[in-house]
Amino acid sequence: MDFQKLKNSYRVHKKKYSLVLKPFNVPKYKKTYKTIIIVPFRDNKFQDRKEQLDKFIPYFQKLFKGSIDILVVEQSEDNRKFNRGALLNIGMLLAMARGYKVMISHDFDLLPDKIAKEYYLTYPFSPIHLGNMWKEKYTYDRFIGGAMSMNQKDIIKSNGYPNDFWGWGGEDDALGIRLSKENISILKPQNGIIREMKHEDTKKIKELRNLTFIESVMKDNNTW
C-alpha cells in the first residue's frame, strides 16, 4: 500500500470512530480525590529535556502546593526510541497500586497557568483533555495529546495506551479510538492556558519520530 492510500485509509478509519468532544467549564463545587501527575521521560541529544524536567517539577510543586503528586517514569538507555505509551501505562499501574483515583498523563514541557490549574483539581467523571488549553501549537478538535486527566475506571475500561508505539506520535490517536469504542466522551476545557517550554520541534527530528505511526494506530485498532 503506498503512503497516500495509507493516509486516506487512516482518515476513513478515524471517521469511523468519532470522538465525542464536549466543552467543559470547571464546576462550581469540586470534590477532590487523590491525584497524581504521571510524566514519561527520556533525555536525548537533540533537545534540552533534562533541563525542562528540572523546571517542570518545581513549577508544579509551587503551583499546586502539595495538592497533587508527581511521578516521573524514565525509559532506560535501551537503544530504542521513546515509548511514551508504555511509560504512561507503567506509571498508571504504579499509581493505582498506591491508591490514586485520578491520573494525569502529562508531557514535561507544558506548564499550566493559575486558571488552568482548576481543571487539574477537578475530578474527571469523563476524561478531561487538559492539553486543549495548549492553543499556541494545536487548535484542531481531534488533538488529545499533551495532558489528559482520567479516572481509574475509564483507564481500565479503555485499557490505557498502546505499549508498542516506538518514537514520537500515534499513541494519543490510539487512546482516542479506544475511548470512542467504549463510548467515553472527552471534556475540553474552555478557559486557562498551557504554555510550552521552547525546544526543537520533535516532528522535525526523524531520529525521534514514530515513522510508522499511521500503520501502528490502524494495527492497534484491529488487534485491541
Region spans (language model):
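C-terminal catalytic/acceptor-binding lobe
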Residues: 1-20, 30, 164-167, 173-224
